[in-house]
């Protein structure tokens, strides 16, 4: 019951998943089983070297960036970094989801029938199952989580698939809970991707043949197996040690030197890992802790055991039948750092140092949670919301009463309220920059980046305060000294806030902000090729409503003929910005606003055909 509560899967589903995974060995690419309200898709594993490291991929670990259009959620929202996955595994998925195959139609049928879908596989078939689950989440589930059923992914001895961004994105979207990966203690396959391709390429073909359960039994005297195991674990050790040093901020000098000239594997665990021993099952859902355990659970207690482990690492890859059959007889532990982990890790053969590193990883996650709580406290203690409310409910209305709006009032800063607004602007920036620092250092839980309450607060802050930052930038003539605000002056806090909001509103449609923006621009019929328009709008403020004033400031001093495309783009975006609350129409059309004063200087022919002509009818009539 405890296992099901943690993972969302029961013993029967695990047994059926393993059974389907065995059947997948007999199929071309995948095997489908249907029983009651569940449909299981099991993927055939491959034990060919080219299906672990794509021959055309020249990188040290066979990795490739995911396609952002196909996998829009698999990235860090703020930084914009896209997740990396193993290219060979990705190509296998692409072949399976090709519309010419039966797979997509089978998934569509299961979706329409309102059946729960389980993706599963043994060995590299598990890698395909992981990517297929992400594909399903992006293509179906994210569009309407209240309609589409939650999928499950159950793997047995699967290799690692993606990098830390892959793991982070699953955590942010709260999808990690859908992935359960069973690992026999010494199984080498979940560790292979932590090794450099150059380290194992000579021995990999032979070892993969030994890993194939359809081939002959393991040769205990085979030197190539020992060599392969030693090289994989040597690289795994380097990765694990570097990771824990980065985690705790105690980087050892030799590791810093080593990492400067030696590439380390980008692959990291994702989801829940269930380690199995003779006595117990140990579930871990902390990626950093899992990485340490992948190394420290496979170590020997003495020299005699060490000589046997390389061959045990092959046999354990064949042991999942026994694991599944004995699950009901084993103790179950969830390694979350709350309870004593000594006995649990002892049973897994983890050394004292290993226990310290696993505990350190679990403690770091606790610190991330504490940091999130502190942010909430700071927002409350610093009267964050009251400061925003003062700008919104007092400062803005008073400025608007003077017919010039709060942007222009702040830019001039002649009144006492302008000084107060500047103080509050600086205080609010301090809070946001503190949060941003924690996000950049990965010192907040993965879920924080996608937290709806935080996104809404950051959006309110960006819309309200960024115009003041733009006004301040131009008041001090930084545009002349440093360059345009959009190119040189825009604080990262606003970029992160903008991207978080865009992800939040576009996610249900499986879209990315850049494509949406350029589709809108293309629909404005500006009379140029899209490539020319993209070059013209590079570093413009038309991609974000809170940057409206930055674009106005850049346009107002230039000849119309030089900036016609930018003017029309700004006008074309403005209506939707007003509707969405990005721009305050009560502000920008005021008699004394910088925008209105600039707009009336535009050529009469332009104004007569402008989408803003209804707002500016008196100006058109006067001119």
From Swiss-Prot:
It comes from Arabidopsis thaliana (Mouse-ear cress). Keywords: Acetylation, Coiled coil, Cytoplasm, Endoplasmic reticulum, Hydrolase, Microsome, Nucleus, Plant defense. The lineage of its organism: Eukaryota, Viridiplantae, Streptophyta, Embryophyta, Tracheophyta. This is Protein EDS1. Disruption phenotype: No effect on RPS4-mediated resistance against avrRps4 bacteria, due to the redundancy with EDS1B. One of its GO terms (molecular function) is lipase activity. Homodimer. Interacts with RPS4, RPS6, SNC1, SRFR1, AvrRps4 and HopA1. Part of a nuclear complex made of EDS1, PAD4 and SAG101, that can be redirected to the cytoplasm in the presence of an extranuclear form of EDS1. Interacts (via N-terminus) with PAD4 (via N-terminus). Interacts (via N-terminus) with SAG101. EDS1-SAG101 and EDS1-PAD4 form separate complexes in pathogen-unchallenged cells. Part of a nuclear protein complex made of VICTR, PAD4 and EDS1. Interacts with VICTR. GO terms for biological process: aerenchyma formation; defense response to Gram-negative bacterium; leaf abscission; lipid metabolic process; plant-type hypersensitive response; regulation of hydrogen peroxide metabolic process; response to hypoxia; response to singlet oxygen. Induction: Up-regulated by salicylic acid or upon turnip crinkle virus or avirulent bacterial pathogen infection. One of its GO terms (cellular component) is chloroplast. The active site is at 123 (nucleophile), 187 (charge relay system), 317 (charge relay system). It is found in: Nucleus; Cytoplasm; Microsome. PROSITE patterns: LIPASE_SER. Its main location: nucleus. Positive regulator of basal resistance and of effector-triggered immunity specifically mediated by TIR-NB-LRR (TNL) resistance proteins. Disruption by bacterial effector of EDS1-TIR-NB-LRR resistance protein interactions constitutes the first step in resistance activation. Acts redundantly with salicylic acid to regulate resistance gene-mediated signaling. Triggers early plant defenses and hypersensitive response independently of PAD4, and then recruits PAD4 to potentiate plant defenses through the accumulation of salicylic acid. The modification N-acetylalanine is found at residue 2. The keyword ATP-binding does not apply. Residues 358-383 form a coiled coil. The keyword Lyase does not apply.
